[in-house]
Amino acid sequence: MTKNIEPRHYDVIVAPVVTEKATLASEHNKVLFKVAAKATKPQIKEAIEKLFDVKVKSVNTLVRKGKTKVFRGNLGSQSNTKRAIVTLEEGHRIDVTTGL
């Protein structure tokens, strides 16, 4: 596979999600990423395939609603975040502990 990495691919993928649930999902060839709020599934798939040189089987997305917090007596809210659950083809793996 050719690696035609473009700067926009780095704008789509914000960071890998390293949680207990994400670690359990990695046993089933799934990797979780925090992605840009306006990123679409085809953009996420293309970015993952180019950046990590793997084949993506499917992409599922979800939006986590921001929490309401009190800071110095003022009510505020955290931003919503978008996550992508990327299912990889058999034989392909991504080690999220290494850098891009």
Curated annotation (Swiss-Prot):
Sorted alphabetically, which Gene3D superfamilies does this protein's record hold?
Answer: 3.30.70.330
Query: Is Amino-acid biosynthesis among this UniProt entry's keywords?
Result: no
Name the domain of life this protein comes from. Answer: Bacteria
Give an example GO cellular component term for this record.
cytosolic large ribosomal subunit
| Signal sequence bounds | none
Ordered alphabetically, the record's keywords are: Ribonucleoprotein, Ribosomal protein, RNA-binding, rRNA-binding
Q: Which PROSITE patterns match?
A: RIBOSOMAL_L23
Q: Does the keyword Ribosomal protein apply?
A: yes
Q: Where are the membrane-spanning stretches? A: none
Q: Name one GO biological process term.
A: translation
Q: Which GO terms describe its molecular function?
A: rRNA binding; structural constituent of ribosome
Q: Name one Pfam family in it.
A: Ribosomal_L23
Q: Provide the family line.
A: Belongs to the universal ribosomal protein uL23 family.
Classification via HAMAP family: Ribosomal_uL23_B
Purpose: One of the early assembly proteins it binds 23S rRNA. One of the proteins that surrounds the polypeptide exit tunnel on the outside of the ribosome. Forms the main docking site for trigger factor binding to the ribosome.
Q: Please state what the protein is called.
A: Large ribosomal subunit protein uL23
The opening ranks of the lineage are:
Bacteria, Pseudomonadati, Pseudomonadota, Alphaproteobacteria, Hyphomicrobiales
The coding gene here is: rplW
